[in-house]
Amino acid sequence: MMKRNLLTVALLALGLSVGAQNVICHIDPNAIFYVGENALVYNGGGVETKGNGVYDIRGNVMVVGTSSDSFKTLTTGGGSKSDGGNFILRLNNPANFASSTYGQLYITGLSQGNISGIVDKEYRTKKHGTYQQIALPFYNKVISSLSGTASTIGTLGKTFSNVRYSKNEVLTWTNATAVSDNLNVSAVTPKNTTYYMLGSLGLDTSAPPATMPANAPAPNGSVYTLKGRPYANGATELLRNAANGINFGPGGTNTNSYNERYNSYLQDNWDYTANPSNPWSVATFGKNIYQFGNPYFTNLDLSLIGITELATITDNNAISSIQGIRYDPGTVVSAPNVGTYSVAAQFVNFTAGAPVPVGDVGLIIKPMQTFVIKLRNNDAELNGNKTLNFDNLRRFKNTPRASATNYSVTAARFASENNGTVKQLGIIGLDQNGEELARTYFAVYPTATTGQTSEPTVQSILGSDNILGTFEESVNGGIDPNYANSYWLYINEANENDFFGKALPLSLYSSSIKFLKFEVRENTDLVADGVHNLSTGIGFYYKAANGAISEIAQNQVIPVSGDQYNLYYGKSLVLGTDVTSKPSRTMVVYNGSIDKFVVRFDPLWKKSDIKVYDMSGKLMLSQKEVSTSQDFEINLAKANAAYIVTAVSEKGEKISSKIIR
């Protein structure tokens, strides 16, 4: 089939000439070289277009050459052509951009000085809130060229400025100082792996203005088109010293070079659960975090960066200290007197030792996407275990590569290797039409920790607006009441031996969830549809509201019959401790930006009565009919004393939490 695709591509090229010095593929004026979806074109040398000649790419193109080869877009007269419109990387289904395929370009061997051609990259993706998290894989691109009217191709249809906090500025993340720095709009793109944050006032990347032009035949208003010179291969990053030596201060109250409190923007979803009452006291909280943008016009496959592969040709990465990857920034919120933070970000976390990913294990980063890596430590590099090499992460497919398969950009997809011990259950909430609304994960393995621990785990927390998740479990099964009103979890881990057959409560907080779909994996690999037992001969179970205990099978879908389920790994004579009602999402949490504990309310609560007692039972604070539209600040003097906080909703739902202030 691939040969047929290649042949078709060749026949569709009009005016194609071969043989110019250091150029294998030359596209003359008025010619179109069309690369269809799923097709692959290999160029063993340089490539150039002339005049209005077009390389229209809906599939995959490889340009493999040497330092003397070139990648050019030329005018009819032979000069350098810089306005684009020649090498076009298409978004094949803009209306369904999240699932659409797209054209990809792989360049290797060419020197940066010989890459002068302009690539047009069609861009449309979900909006990230107040600041768009983005990679700009364009060499030496002037930042102000992103500015323009809603009818100017090559721009984002707005004007960027240098005014911090205006939501019109361009920011870049600096790993060493843990700061978002202003990038002057007169500057050029500073580095191939830079993580950018574009102020999104007047910008919706999911819905281009109707007047925004596109390269024909794409209709106006269907995509943004960003233009620039691609980077040469060779991108690497040393993963050391992120925020090393920085004193964040008590509760993150120290300030950075912009006089911003660290706790107003710096998040560490990985280390939060180590001490939820004061996460900033954890030695590694906010440190060893590295933010990058994809430097290339190909996907990046991050699934194997933490392991020593079985293949002969690998991705050249074995970062054994990896703790997790944030692969989706969620929604960025900027709140007055609070700061800027991310909500509903998505994570893949890794077990310790010989890392195995847990969570959304796909780990494919698309062109122009960003990602964040958290390491467990800042140890010195040993045999390259702290260097991220980007070149062999490049991949055309949107599925991970198997570790036993030799690396190439076209390598086969991930296949079962049956040598893992991480068993993972994904629970996906679907609406009436079968569309995904939310998901959560339950993972078990021999070295996992049951219940709360101060040590790093694969767990990630949820916010009050999430609608599906689990809570920290008690070692005997059920919810640990000590943490039920402190946090709940997107990824939850338990030890497969000491939590065998015990209940992990699953809570639903939306009547829109009509079905639950189950996704069963072992060591990241999906088991076959309909299969229950894993390699241990043991599988997952669920208990519904009617009390029936049922096996869970891969790709199984069940109708929702209540808002509380129990999940189990393994079936024992006594299946753990059940929970008869789900906890509230109202939490008592520490807000470092104001140095106070706050009550953060479940969105279903309208009003609340709040009381605070000291440990002798004396009432210290009482307030009735508190509005739940914002956090309630608990105003207590610092005395290193313990208190009990209670909150009761207008319907009588009650939460209680212990704090130390």
Language-model-detected regions and their locations in the chain:
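Sec-dependent, cleavable N-terminal signal peptides
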Residues: M1-V23, E653-I655, I660-R661
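Extracellular beta-sheet-rich ligand-binding/adhesion modules
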Residues: A10, L14-G109, R376-N377
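Tight coil/turn sites that cap or link beta-strands
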Residues: D28-A31, G36-N38, G44-G46, N52, ...
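Extracellular, surface-exposed repeat architectures
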Residues: N92-N140, G245-P279
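Conserved "landmark" site that anchors the functional core of diverse proteins
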Residues: K127, Q133-V170
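Extended, domain-scale alpha-helical bundle/helix-rich regions
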Residues: V185-L201
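Compositionally biased Ser/Thr/Gly- and acidic/asparagine-rich
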Residues: G202-D631, A637-A639, S649-R661
